[in-house]
Amino acid sequence: MLPSACPECQGKANLGFVGIAANPKEYHYHSVAEDRLVLITPNREPYQTLHRQGTSGLDLLDRPMILREENSGTRQEMERYLRKQQIDPDSMNVIAQIDNPEAIRSSVSRGLGVSIMSVLAAREYLLSGQLLSFELGDQGAYRKIYLTWRKDAQLSAAEQKFLAFVKDRHPVTAPE
């Protein structure tokens, strides 16, 4: 069974992908990818000018912000990164917390606010020109994507083969 990030999966799936290694006592986490967090805005003025000028996303944190819910991996990584930059996440002007990335992308593209999300999650809107992305500082903010499974799980033969396939292609894992 998977962590609470997927309540509808409880009892139905033994393997899953998550954005934070939240419970290493009960779950194995195997790192499979890294994803960059960026600040996204609608593709309109004044953001177009700021984008051309190379403005950092950190300079736009005072804008009305639409964020993921507090227990999301993206939100936790964003807050961790901001604290590391000496920025209090509670100082942001959060106007909405939404648990649906599509609703966040759509809201931002319509000009209702800005957000911080992963490049992978914003990719389609960025490629179609509906959104702009701003880097979060010189070194950027990153999160890992993990394959996860319970330590006490009895994996089927197919699940074990899939796990071996992933581990073969991504040999680095999260600390236990």
Task: Walk through the language-model features, giving the residues of each.
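Hydrophobic hinge/microswitch elements
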Residues: M1-S4, C9-K12, I87-L132
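Short beta-strand-centered segments that line the small-molecule binding cleft or hinge
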Residues: L2-P42, T49-H51, S109, L132-F134
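Short secondary-structure boundary/capping segments
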Residues: H28-S31, S56-L58, K84-Q86, R123, ...
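Short helix-loop capping/hinge motifs at secondary-structure junctions, enriched
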Residues: R44-S56, D152-A157
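Secondary-structure junction motif
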Residues: Q48, P64-Q86, S156, T173
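A late-sequence structural motif
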Residues: L132-P175
